[in-house]
């Protein structure tokens, strides 16, 4: 999807799991969680940066800083 119609980071993507926006390097992924509210259990999803993507972004950032000079 284009930038204007994608779902931003930390926004709900329960009904449209393939529409997360692109982050710095990678597209956010729709991650789902079980929410228990009283006796009712529902599934809620949000666009997030997975841990391995965060680590890759950090490595690229460190690499750029090392070779900036």
Curated annotation (Swiss-Prot):
> What GO molecular function annotations does the UniProt record carry, in alphabetical order?
calcium channel regulator activity; toxin activity
Recite the UniProt keywords alphabetically.
Amidation, Calcium channel impairing toxin, Cytolysis, Disulfide bond, Ion channel impairing toxin, Knottin, Membrane, Neurotoxin, Secreted, Target cell membrane, Target membrane, Toxin, Voltage-gated calcium channel impairing toxin
Q: Which InterPro entries match?
A: Spider_toxin_CSTX_knottin, Spider_toxin_CSTX_Knottin_CS
User: Could you tell me which cysteines form disulfide bridges?
Assistant: 6-21, 13-30, 20-47, 32-45
Has UniProt tagged this entry with the keyword Phosphoprotein?
A: no
Q: Name one GO biological process term.
A: killing of cells of another organism
Domain of life, per UniProt, equals: Eukaryota
Entry's family note: Belongs to the neurotoxin 19 (CSTX) family.
Role played: Spider venom toxin that shows calcium channel blocking activity and exhibits cytolytic activity by affecting the outer leaflet curvature and/or pore formation across the membrane. It blocks L-type calcium channels (Cav1/CACNA1) in mammalian neurons at nanomolar concentrations. Furthermore, it produces a slow voltage-independent block of mid/low and high voltage-activated calcium channels in cockroach neurons. Potassium ions, histamine, M-ctenitoxin-Cs1a (AC P83619), CSTX-9 (AC P58604), and CSTX-13 (AC P83919) synergistically increase the insecticidal activity of this toxin.
- Name of this chain's protein: Toxin CSTX-11
Q: Which organism is it from?
A: Cupiennius salei
């Amino acid at each position: 999807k284009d930038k204007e119609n994608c779902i931003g980071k930390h926004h709900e993507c329960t009904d449209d799991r393939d529409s997360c926006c692109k982050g710095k390097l990678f597209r956010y992924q729709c991650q789902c969680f079980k929410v228990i509210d009283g006796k009712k259990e529902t599934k809620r999803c949000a666009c997030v940066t997975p841990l391995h993507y965060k680590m890759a972004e950090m490595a690229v950032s460190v690499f750029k800083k090392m070779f900036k000079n």
